[in-house]
């Protein structure tokens, strides 16, 4: 895109939130190498025929390629080794939840920048019999946390919410994965953790992605105990070398034998607290012993006859996507993909949904959330009427009107019985707070930055949030994680998706769904298509470089939109039902792969 027309502003850190997607379908016990799909959907009335996409001439991902196809089980992930672990669980007779849990623990070994034991996340489940569930294992603020703990004497933020021991919330990942397995898994937990233990104790081959990631974050890791593990000679493990993690292997063995007990009340908890004391952190044995994941009622919504199953608060993802898509539905018929009219509608709906997200959402145990209003069709119709057809509206004016009226990884699982799981987990930043639990082998998160440290001041993603998300002891911080399951108008599973990238998770996830439903794109095209992002403040539209035609840009500028350039808008991993099985893929913006059988 011509830089005369695109004004580049400081981009917010895309790398902070990472996503992994895993789709698993149980079937016959023989394994096939996953191959590019040539399957067509013509002739199957339950699966609408896809329409070839047309992207701008300068766009870096050409339309028309195929995602990976597998008839029985498929795992699509930012990390191929973790994807192989998920497929392995299914071959051993496990269900979708077994595969999701095994993949999650494997990611803690092979994808340490985001996969984790020291973070938290969300899981959305739909069983084949129609039951749905949502597990919230988001981190919580330590009991010693205070509302203004990151505000210095000069009234400015002191930076302690993003790096170092005071940035860490009480981790929920281990409790969450063990609880999900307890309720829905069918294999012994020791078998589910066995692949991750093997990867940690025997090691795996370092690829360029891990090598570069560690090198870029040496400043974050180097001040704590992880330096000796990840930079033993002053440099990260070389590409092609075998990386062994004996401390982490020991921790995983303890979890395999005791579940979450040792992590929250035993020797692993002792190691976490000792690390906190050495570095001046806040997490105590009482914090860990009190932590509990929470089962919640999934958020159910509809869009043009399709059903969405998503995560309710403390995640903001499901609520914001629901409101945004309800507004678009009320706004009227869909304009062509990539047109100024379509981008204007998308940006305007997103702007309004983010205004509500940033001011009204938080931990439901601490704040009263008008959830039924925000997700209602009636409210969306009223909000849609505030969108002009030919000009942009200022966020400051809209905020008054509406008041009156990470690093992350995502994985998605589908098994042959029709059970589906969408999971997103995070450390927030790459390698979290940088604090490494010596003797236990894992990083702790820096999720405290997802709270409103000071109303009116942006966090690392540029989000300006309100008092509903302020810090309080034991409170869950707001998140943009958006694990989502989509059903077709007949109630059949269609899509399992989620993304990485801070608040841009919401944009990527919603636009993949819209591409599939409104524009009838194939999975590859829906994932590859150019994306846009509007989070209310800054009051502007981010567009991916090369993803917009000059004439469209000029029209948006005439309408009063401030448009700026982004290298990328999140990174998703998704699975879609097609004739004869499933397609799955990691985002072309990422470096993972798909494994299936």
Predicted regions and their residues:
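Bacterial N-terminal signal peptides that target proteins for export
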Residues: 6-22
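Bacterial N-terminal signal peptides
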Residues: 21-30
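Internal maturation/activation junctions in enzymes
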Residues: 52-53, 330-427, 439-440, 447, ...
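Active-site rim segments in enzyme catalytic domains, especially the processed small/beta chain
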Residues: 109-134, 282-284, 420-489, 523
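Extended C-terminal subregions enriched in glycine
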Residues: 475, 509-510, 518-567
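Short, small/polar residue-rich loop motifs at catalytic or cofactor-binding pockets
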Residues: 295, 405-408, 430, 479-481
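Noncatalytic scaffold domains of N-terminal-nucleophile
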Residues: 35-84, 88, 96-97, 101-258, ...
């Amino acid at each position: 895109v011509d830089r005369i027309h695109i004004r580049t502003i400081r981009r917010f850190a895309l790398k902070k939130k990472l996503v992994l997607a895993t789709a698993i379908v149980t079937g016959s016990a023989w394994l096939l190498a996953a191959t590019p799909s040539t399957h067509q959907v013509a002739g199957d009335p339950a699966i609408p025929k896809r329409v070839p996409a047309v992207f701008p001439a300068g766009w870096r991902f050409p339309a028309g390629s195929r995602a990976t196809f597998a008839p029985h089980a498929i795992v699509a992930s930012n990390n191929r080794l973790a994807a192989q672990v998920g497929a392995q669980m299914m071959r051993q007779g496990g269900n979708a939840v077994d595969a999701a849990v095994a993949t999650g623990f494997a990611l803690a070994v092979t994808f340490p920048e985001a996969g984790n034991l020291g973070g938290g996340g969300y899981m959305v489940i739909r069983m084949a019999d129609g039951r749905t569930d949502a597990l919230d294992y988001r981190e919580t603020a330590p009991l010693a946390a205070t509302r203004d703990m990151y505000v210095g004497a000069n009234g400015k933020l002191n930076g302690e919410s993003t790096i170092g021991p005071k940035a860490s919330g009480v981790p929920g990942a281990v409790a969450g994965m063990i609880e999900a397995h307890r309720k829905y898994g069918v294999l012994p937990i020791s078998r589910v953790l066995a692949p991750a233990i093997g990867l940690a104790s025997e090691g795996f081959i370092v690829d360029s992605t891990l090598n570069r990631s560690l090198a870029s974050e040496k400043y974050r890791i180097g001040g704590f105990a992880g330096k000796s593990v990840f930079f033993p000679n002053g440099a990260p493990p070389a590409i092609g070398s075998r990386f062994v993690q004996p401390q982490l292997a020991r921790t995983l063995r303890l979890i395999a034998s005791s579940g979450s007990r040792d992590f929250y009340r035993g020797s692993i908890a002792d190691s976490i607290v000792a690390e906190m004391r050495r570095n001046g952190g806040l997490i105590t044995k009482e914090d860990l012993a009190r932590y509990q994941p929470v089962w919640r009622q999934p958020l159910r919504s509809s869009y043009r006859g399709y059903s969405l199953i998503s995560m309710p608060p403390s995640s903001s993802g499901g609520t914001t996507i629901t409101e945004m898509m309800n507004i678009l539905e009320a706004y009227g018929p869909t304009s062509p993909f990539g047109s100024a009219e379509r981008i204007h509608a998308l940006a305007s709906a997103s702007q309004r949904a983010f205004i509500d997200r940033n001011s009204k959402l938080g931990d439901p145990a601490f704040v009263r959330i008008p959830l039924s209003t925000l997700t209602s069709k009636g409210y969306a119709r009223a909000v849609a009427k505030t969108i002009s057809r030919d000009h942009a509206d200022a966020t400051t004016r809209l905020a008054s009107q509406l008041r009156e009226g990470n690093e992350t990884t995502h994985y998605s699982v589908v098994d042959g019985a029709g059970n589906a799981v969408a999971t997103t987990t995070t450390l927030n930043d790459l390698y979290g707070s940088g604090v490494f639990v010596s003797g236990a082998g894992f990083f702790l998160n820096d999720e405290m930055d997802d709270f409103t440290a000071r109303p009116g001041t942006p966090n690392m993603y540029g989000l300006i949030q309100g008092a509903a998300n302020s810090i309080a002891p034991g409170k869950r911080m707001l998140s943009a994680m958006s694990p989502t399951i989509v059903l077709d108008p007949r109630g059949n599973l269609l899509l399992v998706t989620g993304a990485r990238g801070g608040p841009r998770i919401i944009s990527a996830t919603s636009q993949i769904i819209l591409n599939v439903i409104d524009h009838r794109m194939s999975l590859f095209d829906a994932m590859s298509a150019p994306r846009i992002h509007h989070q209310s403040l800054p009051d502007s539209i981010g567009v991916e470089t090369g993803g917009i035609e000059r004439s469209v840009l000029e029209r948006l500028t005439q309408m009063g939109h401030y448009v700026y350039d982004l290298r990328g808008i999140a990174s998703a991993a998704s699975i879609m039902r097609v004739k004869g099985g499933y397609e799955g893929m990691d985002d072309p913006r990422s470096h993972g792969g798909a494994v299936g059988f």
